[in-house]
Swiss-Prot record:
Keywords: Exonuclease, Hydrolase, Nuclease
Domain (HD) ranges: 163-279
EC number from the UniProt entry: 3.1.-.-
Single annotated GO MF: nucleic acid binding
Domain of life: Bacteria
HAMAP family: 3_5_Exoribonuc_YhaM (MF_01427)
GO terms (BP aspect): rRNA 3'-end processing
Protein name stated in the entry: 3'-5' exoribonuclease YhaM
InterPro entries tied to this protein: 3'-5'_exoribonuclease_YhaM, HD/PDEase_dom, HD_domain, NA-bd_OB-fold, NA-bd_OB_tRNA, YhaM_exoribonuc/phosphodiest
Gene symbol of the encoding locus: yhaM
Organism field: Geobacillus sp. (strain WCH70)
Endpoints of the signal sequence: none
SMART domains for this protein: HDc (SM00471)
């Protein structure tokens, strides 16, 4: 099996096919245009600069294009970067497909669907259960295909559903630890909190923000969807407002995107488990790229910190049959 792009080390030469994940145009100090490419395969992505680009280059090297790249890996300000020596678009004779380069959730779609369905059927409040079932059914295809974000955490195929499954497991453990928590409300909040991203984002590949995503955002979108679902189902009552509050407050603070802070116990828990699972995903994926005894690249979303991979922990994981 060919080595993944994130497993190359500084100084190594690269001669591989990669998928363009995103492209950003810039102007260099000499006044000439350049492109910042984020290139990916199934293992992750890497940044590369394409200097002195022409208008033709800008029209050719676009997201979702497959390219053949020859270059070298180097470290730039604490992050791995691919220095391009030559680049071309892949052609039909190269026999490569976009799906060959897409990172996917480490859990089968049908298994995630089964897990989430179990949690829905564990709900005893009929209003909360019906709204949750209705909305999940309405957006089922996209929910199980979309990433949870464009960057930082769970930004891979089926990342949204995988994020929700992980959060439901955390929620279940906390409900068992704190029996006073409303299980139905917390489970529903977990399932619905990011469902608006199927409208906010453009799709599962090279996701970008839609018009609704830019002007509204996934939080207000889902608050509106809950209201429409309740009206369609003929449901009224306090549950609707509280469920909307769960979604509205899950980012925790106004400066993080929530118009209201959590003011219901389950909303507070939802905020913390969402934050925890997102951060663990960022850290784990960064640690996968380094060897025991090394530090990760700086993680911008985590105050630009690097994380160390202890040697003794890796030995223990291997003894248990896990991965290090």
């Amino acid at each position: 099996m060919a080595k993944g792009i994130v497993h190359y080390e500084v100084g190594e030469q690269v001669d591989v096919y990669l998928l363009i994940k995103s492209v950003t145009k810039g102007i260099a100090s000499n006044g000439k245009p350049f492109l910042t490419l984020i290139l990916q395969d199934k293992t992750g992505d890497i940044e590369a600069k394409l200097w002195d680009v022409s208008p033709e280059d800008e029209s050719v090297y676009v997201p979702e294009s497959i390219v053949k790249v020859l270059g070298d890996i180097h470290n730039y300000r604490g992050k791995m970067q691919l220095k391009i020596r030559s680049i071309r678009l892949a052609h039909e004779g190269d026999a490569v497909r976009v799906s060959d380069f897409l990172e996917t959730a480490p859990m089968k779609r049908e298994d995630m669907m089964e897990k989430i369905t179990e949690y829905i059927f564990a709900m005893q409040n009929p209003n909360i259960q019906r709204i949750t079932r209705y909305l999940l059914k309405k957006y089922e295809q996209k929910f199980f295909d979309y990433p949870a974000a464009t960057k930082n955490h769970h930004e891979f195929i089926s990342g949204l559903a995988y994020h929700v499954v992980s959060m439901l497991e955390l929620a279940k453990a906390l409900v068992n630890l704190y029996p006073s928590l409303n299980r139905d409300l917390l489970y529903a909040g977990v399932i619905l909190h990011d469902l608006g991203k199927v409208i906010e984002l453009s799709g599962p590949v090279s996701a970008s923000y839609t018009l609704e995503g830019k002007l509204l955002g996934h939080i207000p979108i889902m608050v509106g969807e809950i209201s429409k679902a309740a009206e369609h189902l003929g449901i009224s009552g306090e549950e609707i407002v509280v469920l909307q509050h769960m979604v509205l407050s899950h980012h925790g603070k106004a400066e993080w995107g929530s118009p209201k802070p959590p003011m219901v116990k389950e909303a507070e828990i939802l905020h913390y488990i969402d934050n925890l699972d997102a951060k663990m995903n960022m850290i784990d994926r960064a640690l996968e790229k380094v060897k025991p005894g090394e530090f990760t690249e700086r993680i911008y979303a985590l105050e630009n910190r690097s994380f160390y991979k202890p040697i003794f922990s890796s030995v223990l994981m291997q003894e248990r049959g896990g991965t290090s």
